[in-house]
């Protein structure tokens, strides 16, 4: 695993996970493989039946200054058409959000795991903290 999104589990109740490819240009692959990227504030939107990851930061590759892309450009995700339609339906009807959870290598290709989630309220976050603390205390005794 190269990069993970720790904020996603705290801010969302993650329900369903999907593995998808990502369309990258030039030196972005090298930059991501050196973990010079951030998906903490990224999210996925479906625009014109294409899944796009927005607000994902990929730092410029230092050695490849002539071929660098915009660090915050929109990147296309590679999903099957049925998966895109299903995600689009759930986002519209149940008011869910699609967030990236991690980036990793699989068979020499970069993959992104995205999750379908519902946003947590402040009281839900507090309940999770209480449950986690209680479980930690019971393990100690």
Curated annotation (Swiss-Prot):
GO terms for molecular function: RNA binding. The keyword Cytoplasm applies. Keywords: Cytoplasm, RNA-binding. InterPro entries: SmpB (IPR023620), SsrA-bd_prot (IPR000037), SsrA-bd_prot_CS (IPR020081). It comes from the Bacteria. CDD domains: SmpB. Pfam families: SmpB. One of its GO terms (cellular component) is cytosol. SUPFAM superfamilies: Small protein B (SmpB). Signal peptide: none annotated. PANTHER family: SSRA-BINDING PROTEIN, TMRNA-BINDING COMPONENT OF TRANS-TRANSLATION TAGGING COMPLEX. NCBIfam families: PRK05422.1, smpB. This is SsrA-binding protein. It comes from Ureaplasma parvum serovar 3 (strain ATCC 700970).
